[in-house]
């Protein structure tokens, strides 16, 4: 994008840093993941986990959730003011899985939040290290994006379930900061805004008084975040209209849904980062790797290289396919839930199957599931090639408008065409171009109609051998142009439930 000079890179957002040069960014991102690794090692010691148990992704997730809960100021305050039966506001915990006599056992643990905060700070040179917490949130969000569908949430806000490719980051907590905002998809932002407008319609005092002033500031900030994701003048102008509305109502909801639909072809810029489970960073730190000295990037070769050398295990239910479980976690690790399957498969070096064909449920195990029949297997998280993660929507011809398949938000900066069914998308735009945004709507529709599915995005960009860390020899893959590339077709995944 043209305004790149004024933007902080997403590593800077991630580490809360001011403008830094590349080396400083690599060092501060390294410091962040190194802190996560040190914390994880300390927790494994506290819990007396064996090496194998410490590499179990379910244990990693429990430990990550505990530290996120320990630092959730708002919820902690709420829990103290509204004591609920059987919930100690000062404690946090979850299931820890241990191997006993050839079987997996579940043990529910409980810790003082204060104690967890102490261990986290100690691992992070005495600082709160909010960036590391956000990093863990984004990893959980990427895992949710790969695992669950948000059809119900889309329908509730009046959007079309086929817009699922716009929903990256829809389960991120509000406190995820600038790094969180960068990875949220257009649909996620639209949904948050619609929910806000609906509350305003139903509750007369929502925009009023001292609280209402704060609400209004939050509303305008969310509008600006969404505006920044759009890459065409007309879409941005419409966002200005929505933001400046005296009292936002149904007209604004209409405009937002129109914009969300338009983003299926005129895609927004959404950042992608490879955020790995805490145990992966822990393994590397334990083996003596110094992240801060070596430097680390979330968007380059580093996460690929880390996964090449990490052995992570997962619990497997009786009729689940371990290869499918691996695919789910691989996609989550690279934030590739909405990427074209042709591209992901090429990079991974094994065919990635659409979610409707996966024989696996989510990674987390519910408390009522029977542990007797649980097995465990190694997750295959290695890749054949690596590629640079993108923050653009892959729009062609000078970043204006291009083809967007109903279900792709590119993750990797790799040349491909973006197959899309224009008829399906354009059918959603019949009629309504009157009202105060009519000229912008007309302009947006005109740009969408001129988009061609055969246009190539990320021209000349390729993947790299894992030995090519300086990215000197791009290998540009050739894809079967007609091949449909979406993960969500024929979907039968579970809904995301909080």
From Swiss-Prot:
One of its GO terms (molecular function) is structural molecule activity. Keywords: Capsid protein, Helical capsid protein, Host nucleus, Host-virus interaction, Ribonucleoprotein, RNA-binding, Viral nucleoprotein, Viral penetration into host nucleus, Virion, Virus entry into host cell. Its main location: virion. Late in virus-infected cells, may be cleaved from a 56-kDa protein to a 53-kDa protein by a cellular caspase. This cleavage might be a marker for the onset of apoptosis in infected cells or have a specific function in virus host interaction. InterPro entries: Flu_NP. Coiled coil: none annotated. GO terms for cellular component: helical viral capsid; host cell; host cell nucleus; ribonucleoprotein complex; viral nucleocapsid. A motif (Bipartite nuclear localization signal) lies at residues 198-216. It is found in: Virion; Host nucleus. Homomultimerizes to form the nucleocapsid. May bind host exportin-1/XPO1. Binds to viral genomic RNA. Protein-RNA contacts are mediated by a combination of electrostatic interactions between positively charged residues and the phosphate backbone and planar interactions between aromatic side chains and bases. Belongs to the influenza viruses nucleoprotein family. This is Nucleoprotein. It comes from Influenza A virus (strain A/Teal/China/2978.1/2002 H5N1 genotype W).
